[in-house]
UniProtKB/Swiss-Prot annotation:
Name of this protein: NADH-quinone oxidoreductase subunit N
Chief location of this protein within or outside the cell: membrane
Job description of the protein: NDH-1 shuttles electrons from NADH, via FMN and iron-sulfur (Fe-S) centers, to quinones in the respiratory chain. The immediate electron acceptor for the enzyme in this species is believed to be ubiquinone. Couples the redox reaction to proton translocation (for every two electrons transferred, four hydrogen ions are translocated across the cytoplasmic membrane), and thus conserves the redox energy in a proton gradient.
Enzyme Commission number, as recorded: 7.1.1.-
CC per GO annotation: plasma membrane
Family: Belongs to the complex I subunit 2 family.
Length: 475
């Protein structure tokens, strides 16, 4: 039957939605006794969805639901990485949620529904499917940002994110309406084959602006530092990894497949957004003392580097974007694991000064942080350097020499705040009590990410790059 075939194509999202709905029933029935089990159930569902998505990367492109839904090898890999990282982000949240009186089963359900939204927007083959997926992710994210009801900062973060996110959603809907109005089609294939027009160009620009907001690209980044600082740390761990990769992958996929004929127009726009993001992220982070705000500016800069691959266009650009974002989210997961591990008996700490003397009190954590910082900064021979090399190479092949120069400048400037973290850990001393031991899953995420970023083991990137390159070429 066609419906069974359609569901098999959308199997990862069907699994997530099905388990989430079962979770709603179990949570309503067993209430508090289901809180801890819900995270394990959600993580298993996300891991299962990642496995199903990975299995789809080896098959040809396929569509479902009368062309509303499409899966290609490129999309399947983006889904697999997003779901896998989301599962880890859910597991590391347990200790924090328990200590902060946030251990509610609704947290897991919101992450699962948001992850299902990621999958829908990645597989969208129609304007309305795209909008539905993005809004499913966004609505879950707004609630997650304000999930700590006892924190004024969390409520403020959720409100800011909601208000500005609603504006971006309006831009997206307006852009979609312009594209539909000037082409008469909502299907991506039909839009790609439609005649060019000025109205379609305006619609493209509005869609690009909305997706840039969702990805935290400058100059649409203003919500990011405040939300990262105010939202609970496990929520920010999720925000900064899985949805970030999914949004950038969606942007790349739409630009390459739907608006490919407008390449000369949007390549310049994305190149400018990339340059602004790299510079804003580099210079904005210099003045930060809060680690979460610093990592917010780091994420803005790193989205700029990923968009360099989008601006490069074609297959090399698509492969470089997904390679870079995969390395970035793994490294970021480890860094936020360290932020989760930064707690004393009186609660969480998240200032740079709280890292003072870490090399003496917690040498293993200091070494891990050093490796991860060097990786996200792009210092050779860490994994992050190879990620930047891939996007720089793609930009050079497209003769975007000025953009590569901006990227180099941004990388050098951003070393200023990355090295502040290293200096605090290794050169300063502290009279404060030592940090408490990290939770088990937090330690696993920290040292797992450190191992993947370590020079001896970056050979996995060559294997991954080959797979992603093949997937990008196939679809």
């Amino acid at each position: 039957m066609d419906i069974l075939n359609d569901i098999s194509i959308a199997a990862p999202e069907a699994l997530l939605i099905g388990v989430a709905l079962i979770g709603v029933l179990l949570g309503a029935t067993f209430k508090q006794s289901f809180n801890g089990l819900s995270r394990l159930l959600g993580a298993l569902a996300l891991a299962g969805a990642a496995f199903l998505a990975a299995s789809q990367s080896a098959v040809d492109a396929s569509t479902a639901f009368n062309g509303l839904y499409k899966v290609t090898p490129f999309i399947a890999i983006a889904k697999a990485v997003s779901y896998g990282v989301g599962a880890i982000a859910l597991l590391v949240a347990g200790g924090y949620l328990h200590r902060e009186n946030m251990n509610k089963f609704e947290y897991t359900l919101l992450v699962m529904f948001g992850s299902a939204g990621m999958g829908v927007m990645l597989s969208a083959n129609n304007l309305m499917t795209l909008y539905m997926g993005i809004e499913t992710l966004s609505l879950s994210s707004y609630v997650l940002a304000a999930f700590n009801r006892d924190s004024r900062r969390s409520a403020e973060a959720g409100l800011k994110y909601f208000v500005l996110g609603a504006l971006a959603s309006g831009l997206l809907l307006f852009g979609c309406s312009l594209v539909y109005g000037y082409t008469g089609f909502a299907s991506f294939e039909q839009i790609a084959a439609a005649d060019q027009s000025i109205g379609l160009t305006f619609g493209l620009v509005l869609i690009l602006m909305a997706l840039s907001f969702k990805a935290s690209a400058a100059p649409f980044h203003v919500w990011t530092p405040d939300v990262y600082e105010g939202a609970p740390t496990p929520v920010v761990t999720f925000f900064s990894t899985a949805p970030k990769l999914a949004t950038v992958a969606v942007l790349a996929n739409i630009m390459f497949t739907v608006f490919g004929v407008y390449e000369e127009s949007w390549m310049l726009i994305i190149a400018i957004v990339s340059a602004i993001s790299m510079l804003v992220g580099a210079f904005g982070g210099l003045a930060q003392n809060n680690i979460k705000r610093l990592l917010a500016y780091s994420s803005i800069a790193n989205v700029g580097y990923a968009l360099m691959g989008v601006a490069a266009g074609e297959v090399n650009g698509a492969a470089s974007v997904l390679t870079y974002m995969t390395i970035y989210v793994i490294t970021t997961l480890g860094m936020f694991g360290i932020v989760l591990a930064m707690r004393r008996r009186d609660g969480q700490v998240e200032e740079i000064s709280d890292l003072n003397g870490l090399s003496t009190s917690r040498p293993g954590l200091a070494v891990a942080m050093t490796v991860l910082v060097f990786s996200v900064a792009g210092i050779p021979p860490m994994a992050g350097f190879l990620g930047k090399w891939v996007v720089f190479e793609a930009a050079l092949k497209s003769e975007l020499y000025w953009l590569v120069a901006v990227g180099v400048i941004g990388s050098v400037v951003s070393l200023g705040y990355y090295l502040r973290l290293i200096w605090a850990m290794w050169a300063k001393t502290s009279d404060e009590e030592a940090l408490e031991p990290a939770d088990g899953m937090v330690s696993v995420s920290i040292y797992g990410a450190t191992i993947l970023a370590f020079p001896v083991l970056v050979i996995w990137i060559g294997w991954m790059t080959g797979i992603i390159g093949t997937a990008a070429a196939a679809g």
